[in-house]
């Protein structure tokens, strides 16, 4: 692709969520969503992989449907109240339509079915953008309008997403699908605390990005797509395999790694608000999530998949280029809480 065209596309992908976050006008928020949607579609398609075209089509259809629902809600709200922003007088049906559409864009259960399939069919670097940067715009709209939304529906979406994210990742062997289900579960945690403390939603989003980015970078550096390919890293780059194992445990929320921090704070906040049943269910689902990450690490680190060749230690033959960004993010994704425990206070 032409470098100038590529630069324009990436700039537009960056610009869309910025417009949405900085706007108080619903129509401008919608324009920001469309900027990022239309710009990312060409980047999802890989000529060498026909499945990427299918993934891009699924993504476009799902996101376009959600965008139409949001636009319809905005127009109905303007017709009813004569304003481009939701207010206390806004019809509950309009607000529920908007919540459903934003849930589709975020990949929240039960509107999550497109996310694992799309993530599996696109390149790794676009999977990283899809699961991190593309989540910011819809989540920023939710944070702005959450006082008007029905908190019961929000909590139902949250617990369903946490359950589906944990349950869906159990039988997966493809790393991109595992990361997609991880994204669904993390979005559920963000949504669960939104009615009580939106600041914790932002903290959880920031930590989720810190956890997800180095994991995708590790997969890109080693061109690893499956559990089998990761298990073969032990004879090439044992240090990388160790780092991947720690990052997976952090994604699962094992203390004292970084991923434990948001889960700990969110459960504490829910208990302060007398949501004991909700907190208990979320803790149980977190254990299920941690189980499949632990099983994944056991499969890659403590057992060997059958291979056609005799694998020998090749550390002295492997030359890996140092990557400062990956090293920094990997340390942050595992050691932020142990190095700075005052974050929990």
UniProtKB/Swiss-Prot annotation:
GO terms for molecular function: NADH dehydrogenase (ubiquinone) activity. It is a multi-pass membrane protein. It is found in: Mitochondrion inner membrane. Its EC number is 7.1.1.2. Disulfide bonds: none annotated. GO terms for cellular component: mitochondrial inner membrane; mitochondrion; respiratory chain complex I. The chain crosses the membrane at residues 1-21, 25-45, 56-76, 92-114, 149-171, 178-198, 200-220, 241-261, 274-294, 324-344. The keyword Electron transport applies. The keyword Calcium does not apply. InterPro entries: Complex_I_Subunit_2, NADH_DH_su2_C, NADH_UbQ_OxRdtase_chain2, ND/Mrp_TM. It catalyses: a ubiquinone + NADH + 5 H(+)(in) = a ubiquinol + NAD(+) + 4 H(+)(out). It holds the Pfam family NADH_dehy_S2_C. It comes from the Eukaryota. Keywords: Electron transport, Membrane, Mitochondrion, Mitochondrion inner membrane, NAD, Respiratory chain, Translocase, Transmembrane, Transmembrane helix, Transport, Ubiquinone. Belongs to the complex I subunit 2 family. Core subunit of respiratory chain NADH dehydrogenase (Complex I) which is composed of 45 different subunits. Interacts with TMEM242. Core subunit of the mitochondrial membrane respiratory chain NADH dehydrogenase (Complex I) which catalyzes electron transfer from NADH through the respiratory chain, using ubiquinone as an electron acceptor. Essential for the catalytic activity and assembly of complex I. This is NADH-ubiquinone oxidoreductase chain 2.
């Amino acid at each position: 692709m032409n470098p100038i065209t590529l630069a324009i596309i990436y700039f537009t992908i960056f610009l869309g969520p910025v417009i949405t976050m900085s706007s108080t006008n619903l129509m401008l928020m919608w324009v920001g969503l469309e900027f990022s949607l239309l710009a990312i579609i060409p980047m999802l398609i890989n000529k060498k992989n026909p499945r990427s075209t299918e993934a891009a089509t699924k993504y476009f259809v799902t996101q376009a449907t959600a965008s139409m629902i949001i636009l319809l809600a905005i127009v109905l709200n303007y017709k009813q109240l004569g304003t481009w922003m939701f207010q206390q007088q806004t019809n509950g049906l309009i607000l529920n339509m908007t919540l459903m559409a934003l849930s589709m864009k975020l990949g929240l259960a039960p509107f999550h079915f497109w996310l694992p399939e799309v993530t599996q069919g696109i390149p790794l670097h676009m999977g990283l953008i899809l699961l991190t940067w593309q989540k910011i715009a819809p989540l920023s709209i939710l944070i702005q309008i959450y006082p008007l939304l029905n908190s019961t529906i929000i909590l139902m979406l949250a617990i369903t997403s946490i359950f589906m994210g944990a349950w869906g990742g159990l039988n997966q062997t493809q790393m991109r699908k595992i990361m997609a289900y991880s994204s669904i579960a993390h979005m559920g945690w963000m949504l669960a605390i939104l009615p009580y403390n939106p600041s914790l939603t932002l903290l959880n989003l920031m930590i989720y990005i810190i956890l997800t980015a180095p994991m995708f970078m590790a997969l890109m550096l080693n061109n690893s797509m499956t559990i089998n390919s990761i298990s073969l890293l032990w004879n090439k780059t044992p240090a990388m395999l160790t780092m991947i194992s720690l990052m997976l445990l952090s994604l699962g929320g094992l203390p004292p790694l970084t991923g434990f921090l948001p889960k700990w704070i969110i459960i504490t906040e829910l208990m302060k608000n007398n949501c004991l049943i909700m907190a208990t269910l979320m803790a149980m689902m977190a254990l299920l999530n941690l189980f499949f990450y632990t099983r994944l690490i056991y499969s890659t680190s403590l057992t060997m998949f059958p291979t056609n060749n005799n694998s020998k230690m090749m550390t002295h033959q492997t030359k890996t280029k140092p990557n400062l960004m990956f090293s920094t993010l990997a340390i942050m994704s595992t050691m932020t809480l142990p190095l700075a425990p005052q974050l929990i206070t």
